[in-house]
Amino acid sequence: MGLYRKYIEYPVLQKILIGLILGAIVGLILGHYGYADAVKTYVKPFGDLFVRLLKMLVMPIVFASLVVGAASISPARLGRVGVKIVVYYLLTSAFAVTLGIIMARLFNPGAGIHLAVGGQQFQPKQAPPLVKILLDIVPTNPFGALANGQVLPTIFFAIILGIAITYLMNSENEKVRKSAETLLDAINGLAEAMYKIVNGVMQYAPIGVFALIAYVMAEQGVKVVGELAKVTAAVYVGLTLQILLVYFVLLKIYGIDPISFIKKAKDAMLTAFVTRSSSGTLPVTMRVAKEMGISEGIYSFTLPLGATINMDGTALYQGVCTFFIANALGSHLTVGQQLTIVLTAVLASIGTAGVPGAGAIMLAMVLESVGLPLTDPNVAAAYAMILGIDAILDMGRTMVNVTGDLTGTAIVAKTEGELEKGVIA
């Protein structure tokens, strides 16, 4: 029990990094001496279990988180401030995932890998026309879409349901209001239960990552390291550009000094980088907003909302990683599929929980939306490579998520005359 307690209390990030390094070493050694088949038979199943656990969580988290996220936008508070911040969050997320796609095309990660698990190459399905993709967003059977893992229809229904619940909770009819509150409480309970399961699954992550990376290294050799380095570089260069080209430019346009802003924001940014949790960083983020001279009436609404629905860093990561996986499979993503990535990543950001590891679960959802299901062994193998470095990518993307929340809050406060002069503006 003492050893188990020590394992649980040891930081997850460090455990995953240890699993990654040991898996790479073991895989390279065993692969070099011709034991790749043994790794596939005896080690890989532990990694497959990790992937299955993540797949198990995808649709329940998508549905519950999106309903709760959409319902958190109260019509009473939406008003002018709410509309401004929601539009800001959606537009910056769209720019982030587009920037991720651009970075992926520049760095071209995964092109040096040619996956063929069991000698079978990935066989892409013919992409449907864009009009059909858009029409299929509206489900004919929402519960069937949820059960069958159809991502975009589930997102659409969850958002519509969340908005409907919000309006019912503001009904003058007490019975209707209580029914809506009960329904939301139940769905919120489901979401919280899913987050708890995520935390449990992340305790198994070091073992899963060890097994997956050992298998990939035994099969593919050292060339995988270079391709994963490209993914890491593409994500971090993209995240840096998101701060410089989006946040700094917007701050400058609205008369806020970017340097003063960053000096004030650094505590929240560093906390987000270390904890990998937007929600966990929220108390620090709110303190930083107060120190910036932002009115409590603004930041007390925009920052909790941002921790729920604004995930610019995660959206960018999904753009890069989807391209990496497609490249590793030798699959070309059409313009329609790239637009689907943008649409799905932006909508998914509304339901991406602000907890460590949630971004990897949402990536599985984005992959499904462009015809790269984890049920395919080649897709699962490429996804496994991303899981190996996900903790490293998670630190940077969470920092950008929080920086984006603060940027939007400062801009809205400035436009509303709720930003103290002489602090950052």
UniProtKB/Swiss-Prot annotation:
<dbReference type="GO" id="GO:0005886">
    <property type="term" value="C:plasma membrane"/>
</dbReference>
<dbReference type="InterPro" id="IPR036458">
    <property type="entry name" value="Na:dicarbo_symporter_sf"/>
</dbReference>
<feature type="topological domain" description="Cytoplasmic">
    <location>
        <begin position="161"/>
        <end position="196"/>
    </location>
</feature>
<feature type="transmembrane region" description="Discontinuously helical; Name=7">
    <location>
        <begin position="298"/>
        <end position="320"/>
    </location>
</feature>
<feature type="transmembrane region" description="Helical; Name=2">
    <location>
        <begin position="42"/>
        <end position="62"/>
    </location>
</feature>
<feature type="topological domain" description="Extracellular">
    <location>
        <begin position="31"/>
        <end position="41"/>
    </location>
</feature>
<comment type="similarity">
    <text>Belongs to the dicarboxylate/amino acid:cation symporter (DAACS) (TC 2.A.23) family.</text>
</comment>
<dbReference type="GO" id="GO:0140009">
    <property type="term" value="P:L-aspartate import across plasma membrane"/>
</dbReference>
<protein>
    <recommendedName>
        <fullName>Glutamate transporter homolog</fullName>
    </recommendedName>
</protein>
<dbReference type="GO" id="GO:0005283">
    <property type="term" value="F:amino acid:sodium symporter activity"/>
</dbReference>
<dbReference type="InterPro" id="IPR001991">
    <property type="entry name" value="Na-dicarboxylate_symporter"/>
</dbReference>
<feature type="binding site">
    <location>
        <position position="314"/>
    </location>
    <ligand>
        <name>L-aspartate</name>
    </ligand>
</feature>
<feature type="transmembrane region" description="Discontinuously helical; Name=4">
    <location>
        <begin position="122"/>
        <end position="160"/>
    </location>
</feature>
<feature type="intramembrane region" description="Discontinuously helical">
    <location>
        <begin position="338"/>
        <end position="372"/>
    </location>
</feature>
<feature type="topological domain" description="Cytoplasmic">
    <location>
        <begin position="252"/>
        <end position="260"/>
    </location>
</feature>
<dbReference type="Pfam" id="PF00375">
    <property type="entry name" value="SDF"/>
</dbReference>
<feature type="transmembrane region" description="Helical; Name=8">
    <location>
        <begin position="392"/>
        <end position="412"/>
    </location>
</feature>
<dbReference type="GO" id="GO:0070207">
    <property type="term" value="P:protein homotrimerization"/>
</dbReference>
<feature type="binding site">
    <location>
        <begin position="276"/>
        <end position="278"/>
    </location>
    <ligand>
        <name>L-aspartate</name>
    </ligand>
</feature>
<keyword id="KW-0812">Transmembrane</keyword>
<feature type="topological domain" description="Cytoplasmic">
    <location>
        <begin position="63"/>
        <end position="80"/>
    </location>
</feature>
<keyword id="KW-0472">Membrane</keyword>
<keyword id="KW-0868">Chloride</keyword>
<feature type="topological domain" description="Cytoplasmic">
    <location>
        <begin position="290"/>
        <end position="297"/>
    </location>
</feature>
<feature type="topological domain" description="Extracellular">
    <location>
        <begin position="219"/>
        <end position="230"/>
    </location>
</feature>
<dbReference type="GO" id="GO:0070778">
    <property type="term" value="P:L-aspartate transmembrane transport"/>
</dbReference>
<dbReference type="GO" id="GO:0046872">
    <property type="term" value="F:metal ion binding"/>
</dbReference>
<feature type="transmembrane region" description="Helical; Name=5">
    <location>
        <begin position="197"/>
        <end position="218"/>
    </location>
</feature>
<feature type="topological domain" description="Extracellular">
    <location>
        <begin position="321"/>
        <end position="337"/>
    </location>
</feature>
<feature type="transmembrane region" description="Helical; Name=1">
    <location>
        <begin position="12"/>
        <end position="30"/>
    </location>
</feature>
<keyword id="KW-0769">Symport</keyword>
<feature type="binding site">
    <location>
        <position position="310"/>
    </location>
    <ligand>
        <name>Na(+) 1</name>
    </ligand>
</feature>
<feature type="binding site">
    <location>
        <position position="401"/>
    </location>
    <ligand>
        <name>Na(+) 1</name>
    </ligand>
</feature>
<feature type="binding site">
    <location>
        <position position="405"/>
    </location>
    <ligand>
        <name>Na(+) 1</name>
    </ligand>
</feature>
<dbReference type="GO" id="GO:0042802">
    <property type="term" value="F:identical protein binding"/>
</dbReference>
<feature type="binding site">
    <location>
        <position position="401"/>
    </location>
    <ligand>
        <name>L-aspartate</name>
    </ligand>
</feature>
<feature type="binding site">
    <location>
        <position position="352"/>
    </location>
    <ligand>
        <name>Na(+) 2</name>
    </ligand>
</feature>
<feature type="binding site">
    <location>
        <position position="394"/>
    </location>
    <ligand>
        <name>L-aspartate</name>
    </ligand>
</feature>
<keyword id="KW-0915">Sodium</keyword>
<feature type="topological domain" description="Extracellular">
    <location>
        <begin position="373"/>
        <end position="391"/>
    </location>
</feature>
<keyword id="KW-0813">Transport</keyword>
<feature type="topological domain" description="Cytoplasmic">
    <location>
        <begin position="1"/>
        <end position="11"/>
    </location>
</feature>
